[in-house]
Amino acid sequence: MTSLLEIKDLTAFYGPLRAIKDVSLSIQEGSVTALIGPSGCGKSTLLRTLNRMHELSPGAKVKGQVLLDGRDLYQLDPVYVRQEVGMIFQRPNPFPTMSIRENVLAGIKLNRKRIHRIQQNELMERCLRSVNLWDEVHNRLGRPGGELSGGQQQRLCIARAIAVSPRVILMDEPCSALDPVSTKAIEQLICKLKEKHTIVIVTHNMQQASRVSDWTAVFNVARSGGSGELVEHDKTEVIFTSPKNEVTLNYISGKFG
């Protein structure tokens, strides 16, 4: 298995505030990597640096490198980067006034890709089937995406993301606003999606991390008001059964966080 994303000595700032410090991490192609750790340790900040969303925040900047297949993301067109590296947010965010069909195809139209309507319909159906949503919505594709349940909306957002064929999908707490049944559906979907995509997921749910991920990276803040730092990165089974770092052991055993 080869590294698709390489994070090298990455430090991220919000104005004068240093959110994460000197993070180096390899993301394996075709795998699910979970980022875990207590609140405020920089997990979501790191995730946002991986498709250049971090720089959209006022005063935000990064030092270090993020390489996609050896190419520095910060030397590439950000529009291209976000085609290659999609993002799923904590709360489902379908475009509320767009139909289900329009939501799936939104990225295609945003990127001005011209494809025939027949091809559009084939792509839409393929993406909705990929997220196990087609059977639930095929007879109401013209209805607004905002009418769907929370779990359905999140799957619609994933269908929208994969429509542009990203190599990497970032997920920031994708199940935190969902009920247990919808959470199970998303977790099953994550395991299916890694056949075609590399996935990086931020989660506070350690059981979820152990269920869906192949690799786990543990983050922590060394002191109050300090920067988030990478503590340990290893195969998920190792992290949860025989961690090498005492901080990791204390976190997964519930002694803090």
Curated annotation (Swiss-Prot):
Domain ABC transporter span(s) in chain numbering: 5-246
Keywords: ATP-binding, Cell membrane, Membrane, Nucleotide-binding, Phosphate transport, Translocase, Transport
Compartments, record wording: Cell membrane
Keyword Translocase: yes
GO cellular-component term (any): plasma membrane
Enzyme class per UniProt: translocase
Binding sites annotated in the UniProt record for ATP: G37, P38, S39, G40, C41, G42, K43, S44
Reaction catalysed by this enzyme: phosphate(out) + ATP + H2O = ADP + 2 phosphate(in) + H(+)
Function (record text): Part of the ABC transporter complex PstSACB involved in phosphate import. Responsible for energy coupling to the transport system.
Protein known as: Phosphate import ATP-binding protein PstB
Organism, as annotated: Tropheryma whipplei (strain Twist) (Whipple's bacillus)
Protein's gene: pstB
